[in-house]
Amino acid sequence: MPCADPVAGILAEILKLYTRRARRLAVRACEASGYDVSAALVDASGETLAFAKGDHSTVHTKDTSFRKAYTVATLGPIFKFETLGAFVEKMRGNPNANAFASLPNILLLAGSVSVMANGESVAAIGVGGAPGGEKDEACAAAGLAKIKDRLPH
């Protein structure tokens, strides 16, 4: 049985550390603007890697942040979008939007960004709880911006 590539394993762990930091930074960015949010980090297949809940965020923000991240991670590579806001805009007026919205864990509300490494989506950060998806997405983008230069290009 062949051994797993140890370098790839180390790089994967480093990537997880950086993206977990970005998730925490997204919550802090929203808190600095006075928003109580939660942030979810999922891998490319939509599995939860980490979750951060702001001190005063409400319980529903756990689900919305996950669903936003899940939507970007699982549909972004197929439909070529890196932010959920871009996909929501693309779906506006599309007769298929209701079909997408009925899929489990899909949420057509802005608030998530894709984490790109070596030109491919490797994770997504979703934020929920600010008064408007565009504000959630700005916080997710702010968290990602803090670590983006450290990710493999």
Regions found by a protein language model. Give the residues of each.
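Flexible, solvent-exposed loop/hinge segments and secondary-structure transition points
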Residues: P2-H153
